[in-house]
Amino acid sequence: MKKSENLDLITIGRSSVDLYGSQIGGRLEDMRTFQKYIGGSPTNIAAGAARLGLKSAIITRVGNEHMGRFIVEQLKKEGVNTDGFKIDQERLTALVILGIRNKNDFPLIFYRENCADMALSTNDIDKKFISCLLYTS
């Protein structure tokens, strides 16, 4: 991995695909259609920072499958540096299914057992790449 060049922010941690139920106000049990988004606090922060004009990057793991490629491609479109991504050949990308009932209630189900980002380790971090780090949980 190359040294980070003038990055304002590097996040590290969870990357997932969030599937939001399109029928706002309904129960998850009743959802028929979903919209697909990138998810995970570090992923969302990196994308949001890029939208605000900052040079951001993320260190994470995703699976070598459709959902993992979706996250990488979406972040590249947002202008996020993805040099810190590790592609996991054995694990799938995390998935979250969510609904929006009202402003205070949003049911969700995490599919994260043995997923790629849960296998992220210190060995995945190139010290030359890090210039700053924001920890979120």
Regions found by a protein language model. Name each.
Residues 61-63, 83-91:
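Beta-strand->loop->alpha-helix junctions that form or flank phosphate-binding loops
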Residues 135-136:
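Conserved small/polar residues in nucleotide/adenosyl-binding loops
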Residues 88-90, 94-114:
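Glycine-rich nucleotide/cofactor/substrate-binding loop typically near the N-terminus or early
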Residues 2-4, 26, 89-90, 100-103, ...:
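Solvent-exposed alpha-helices and their adjacent loops that cap or buttress functional pockets
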Residues 115-119:
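A generic, well-ordered mixed alpha/beta core segment in the N-terminal half of proteins
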Residues 2-80, 108, 120-123:
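Glycine-rich phosphate/adenosyl-contacting loop at the front of the ribokinase-like
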Residues 13, 60, 84, 99, ...:
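Pocket-edge structural micro-motifs
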Residues 122-132:
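Short amphipathic alpha-helix with an adjacent loop that forms part of the alpha/beta core around
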